[in-house]
Amino acid sequence: MMKKLLIVSVKAYQKYISPLSPPSCRYKPTCSAYMLTAIEKHGTKGILMGIARILRCHPFVAGGVDPVPEDFSLMRNKNTSKNEKF
C-alpha cells in the first residue's frame, strides 16, 4: 500500500510539477525516474535512495549515467564511471 502511494506521488510530480520548470537533472535516468525504480526495486527504502540521489544532483557534480543499484545503497552506483555522459 505504501509503495503504491509513493509511486503515485512521484508520477503526479512528473506529470504536474516537473513540467513547470526547465529540465535540470544532471543524471540519467532523471532523479524522479530513479526514485520510481528505487521504490519498485527496494520498496519504501527506495525513497531514501531517491532522496540521496536528489541531494547528489547539483551543479557541482558531473552527473552522468547512474542507474539504481541491485542492492540497497545510499551511495552513487559504483558500477558506472563518473565521467560517463549520456
From Swiss-Prot:
It is found in: Cell membrane. GO terms for cellular component: plasma membrane. SMART domains: Haemolytic (SM01234). Keywords: Cell membrane, Membrane. This is Putative membrane protein insertion efficiency factor. Disulfide bonds: none annotated. Could be involved in insertion of integral membrane proteins into the membrane. HAMAP family: UPF0161_YidD. It comes from the Bacteria. It is a peripheral membrane protein.
